[in-house]
Design a protein with these regions (language model features):
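Conserved acidic donor-binding segment of nucleotide-sugar-dependent glycosyltransferases
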Residues: 156-163, 172-177
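Single conserved hydrophobic/aromatic residue that forms the stacking wall/gate
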Residues: 1-6, 10-13, 211-213
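Nucleotide-activated donor-binding/catalytic signature segment of Leloir-type glycosyltransferases, i.e.
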Residues: 82-101
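Conserved donor-binding/catalytic core segment of Leloir-type glycosyltransferases
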Residues: 27-49, 55-58, 70
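Short hydrophobic beta-strand element within catalytic cores of glycosyltransferases
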Residues: 138-141
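Carbohydrate-associated surface elements
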Residues: 17
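Short alpha-helical donor nucleotide-sugar binding micro-motif in glycosyltransferases
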Residues: 100-101, 108-113
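Aromatic "clamp/platform" in nucleotide-sugar-dependent glycosyltransferases that forms part
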Residues: 121
């Protein structure tokens, strides 16, 4: 077992890590017009992940931009409700609700989408955000939990979760050259949250354990 001191070092220095080889960067010149979000469709989770606000932002954008939103995630007790909400707004041509997808499919979506949307009300670490960034995707999210520590200045932090705010930032950045943000996003995850960084942290813990014995 780790000593108390070593355990403290491990918790402090070794956050979640990403396989940055598997989650490699997809260049923006190869990306299309898709938006992507991952959200398990449980009733509380769709509120936490602001899924209805994301859907409403698509309604605001559909006549301005040629874009399509893909929603992935385990089917929960709000799945049918979300499908109905999309249908009643006449957005079936603009939004696909995919349900559960494989990791291979997730990687394809992350490497081909224009923006990854996760404007949450609260988060822990924000693992999906880190995975998206590692794939070089420009993330639109909020300053909650540890998200700002993950994103830094290599993504788009919005001030609130209103549909108008989400829609405005997508429209503002849509025609920008996003390659520099993409490069910065992957680089940040590779530097701070890669498996190589985790291995280094573990070695530091081992050294700490050695020093305490």
């Amino acid at each position: 077992a780790l000593s108390s001191a070593a355990s403290d070092v491990y918790k402090r220095q070794s956050p979640h890590c990403i396989d940055t080889v598997k989650y490699s960067r997809g260049m923006y010149c190869n990306r299309g017009n898709e938006l992507f979000t991952i959200c398990w469709t449980g009733k509380e989770n769709v509120k936490r992940k602001c899924l209805y606000e994301i859907i409403d932002s698509v309604e605001l954008l559909k006549d301005k931009l040629d874009m399509h939103l893909n929603i992935a995630g385990h089917k929960g007790d709000a799945f049918d409700e979300v499908k109905k909400y999309i249908s009643e707004k006449g957005l079936n041509a603009y939004i696909s609700i995919l349900g559960e997808i494989s990791e291979k499919e997730k990687l394809c979506y992350l490497k081909s989408c224009r923006f990854y949307l996760q404007p949450s009300r609260y988060e822990g670490f924000g693992l999906a955000i880190a995975e998206a960034m590692s794939c070089g995707t420009v993330v639109v999210t909020t300053d909650v939990g540890e998200v700002l520590n993950v994103v830094g200045n290599a993504g788009i932090i919005i001030r609130n979760t209103l549909p108008e705010t989400i829609a405005n930032v997508i429209e503002d950045y849509w025609n920008n050259d996003l390659e520099s943000i993409s490069i910065a996003a992957h680089s940040r995850i590779e530097t701070l949250f890669s498996m190589a960084r985790r291995e280094k942290d573990i070695m530091n813990v081992v050294k700490t354990v050695s020093y305490t014995h």
